[in-house]
Amino acid sequence: MKTTYSYTVLRYVHDTTTGEFVNVGVALLAPEARYVSALCRTTYGRLGKVFPGMNGESFKSLMRFIQSRFEEMGTKFREELPLEKVPPSVMPLAHSVLPADDSSLQWAEPGGGITDDPSGTLENIFSRMVTRYDEAPQYERRSDDDVWRKFKRGFESRHVLHRLQPKKIQDAG
């Protein structure tokens, strides 16, 4: 069933004078589906590169708090009788979790659309607006010789290296 939704992006504004920001979360409300949830950044690596000197642990703690508050609201909306009117926009809910003030975390103007999968839409918006420019983790590749050097030291220290013989294994094909 298609349902309308509204969303807002949570921005981290390091210096309100310059107005520079990085998107750090997304909250979404689909009133007819009685769905509300949020996704927030759980790492601060990119933020630390853009704004050196920020307190990463405090940031992560605050992101967990915001996301958990939206999860609590989502549970309440799904499981309780619909006695209270659900707001038509996500903004009143967003401001109930994080009020509009001049702090570093600010809600952007809301957007919206129609979806048949509010959860999937939230993930898509989060991917597009928050994690789009994140660097993929870099894994260090090592050659066979690099790996052998590490193990060789251990074998040498235990005086068992002389007992090892090379062996070539071939497949049955």
Per-segment meaning from a language model:
Residues 1-173:
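Polybasic/polar functional segments that serve as interface/processing modules
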